[in-house]
């Protein structure tokens, strides 16, 4: 799969790109039941009814570092094609894994509020990108991602965790800044990439099927750990960065290099 110069320019201007047909249907049809089984088995809220969950729980079931649970999922997470695309989009010679996660929005699941990802990550540069990989065709009614075009350049709500508050603050900022919201259906095989500072959300899932998605977060091979500024960043440092010292390259066993240009 090859990116054009227009693709790269669009990503850097818009903060996201939705690419069609990145992965074959058969590949996703193979991995979907494996990822679904692991997600269900390790769901921290298993047995809790949707109506009894908080805002975050109603938005999706979340499980991180699936690649450590299953060798087959590791193959997908370590996919050179996706890692190369990530590297080319953010303009680095190589990328590391930050982590992967499954995000399953249950039938009748709630919205995912507006937020930015990188406020959770103790990284010292903006050279990060997330691949969002739906595991089924995803119509708008199922709650695919919605992006604020160009919002990664706006410095909006960068210290606000995902919440009712982030939804309110960012909704107001989008109107004030006249940011265009882009929400599109995804065909099976489509993959989108978004910057760590791109504003995004997802609508509720009004269908009777779960919206199943897998994500892989990539960062520059030379990404350094910055001093944490919040409990969320401290949690991430503990979870993913091991004994990396502040200011050092995040190069522990959980953050392997996934692609390096020849």
What are the residue ranges of the model-derived segments?
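Short, surface-exposed loop/helix-turn segments at secondary-structure junctions
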Residues: 116-117, 164-178, 208-210, 229-235
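Non-heme Fe(II)/2-oxoglutarate
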Residues: 38-41, 45, 159-160, 191-193, ...
